[in-house]
Amino acid sequence: MLGFSSLRRYLSSFTTRPLRRIESAKQLAKTMTVLPNTYDEPVRIAVIGGTGLRELPGFTQVASLSITTPWGSPSSPITILHHQCSHNNKTVAVAFLSRHGTHHQIAPHEVPARANIAALRSIGVRTIIAFSAVGSLQEEIKPRDFVIPDQVIDRTKGVRPWTFFEGGVVAHVPFGDPFDEGVAKVVRACGHSLEGEGVVLHDRGTLICMEGPQFSTRAESNLYRSWGGSVINMSCLPEAKLAREAEIAYQMICMSTDYDCWHESTADVTVEMVMGHMKANAQNARRFVTAVLDALASDEHADLVQAKHVEGSIKFGLSTAQANWSPEARAKLEWLFPGYWN
């Protein structure tokens, strides 16, 4: 589990590339290329990168979108990437957003989750694969293992805006199964892409989402273990809840970096420990996301990627008749769901 506010300087040592390393004029020109700020086609799949996955090298960057929503601006520009599938050479557009900002300057409680989800939906996104570094709460989930959670326990403290439906309109959406099982099945089937001695993909688990940015106390860590918690992070919520409200199929992929502080045979979690495992996880994360995108791009998953199974679901959660919506709430929801309301 990560103390994100203290990672900023440490992260820069892995990401900064001095100009002296650029060995040719061609390379320099490439780094200075300005990407278009528009993209005309709908983009159905998005990857939200957290600590440990801040970029997707090997994909072709084709646009960089700066979008302003009624809930503000997202945490980073949305990069549109082209991915060429390995099995059929099909080119798939993917949106990439960095949850904590381009320079990892946004703490977990400061992430503009509503703007992130709204901006992605506005360009056509209906499926999100979200990555997050996590602490392990169980012996069998080792550092460098991956986990596909199927449940979450909310331990945030109410300081993060968590709904699109407020200020004159009320809606209650089901959240009994917080992740999309259809997308999860596709993701689990891609575990073969992970490499490294002893690396395991755990296909289910309960994720504890805590407030942060501080680490857990030992008592808290043991409490979460007693609840059956598998892993812990600071990023899943309200991201997953907002995706559900926005009718987007959402699945998180967790990358274990440490045993939190409950494990008596290891030292307490430190930034250095986390970053060592994170660096090892990064290459596996890129292999994994490539395999997942290949699978999602197949024709058999076309309806899944477009989230046809959740389309229209928010209308059943509305508690406020449209005639009674406030003008401000209506304007925001019409931006999020254009042409959706009577």
Curated annotation (Swiss-Prot):
Pathway: Amino-acid biosynthesis; L-methionine biosynthesis via salvage pathway; S-methyl-5-thio-alpha-D-ribose 1-phosphate from S-methyl-5'-thioadenosine (phosphorylase route): step 1/1. Homotrimer. One of its GO terms (cellular component) is cytosol. It comes from the Eukaryota. Gene3D superfamilies: Nucleoside phosphorylase domain. It comes from Aspergillus fumigatus (strain ATCC MYA-4609 / CBS 101355 / FGSC A1100 / Af293). It catalyses: S-methyl-5'-thioadenosine + phosphate = 5-(methylsulfanyl)-alpha-D-ribose 1-phosphate + adenine. It is an enzyme of class 2 (transferase). Its EC number is 2.4.2.28. Belongs to the PNP/MTAP phosphorylase family. MTAP subfamily. The record marks 216, 271 as: Important for substrate specificity. This is S-methyl-5'-thioadenosine phosphorylase. Phosphate binds at residues 51, 99-100, 132-133, 235. Substrate binds at residues 234, 258-260. Pfam families: PNP_UDP_1 (PF01048). GO terms for biological process: glutamate biosynthetic process; L-methionine salvage from methylthioadenosine; purine ribonucleoside salvage. GO terms for molecular function: mRNA binding; S-methyl-5-thioadenosine phosphorylase activity.
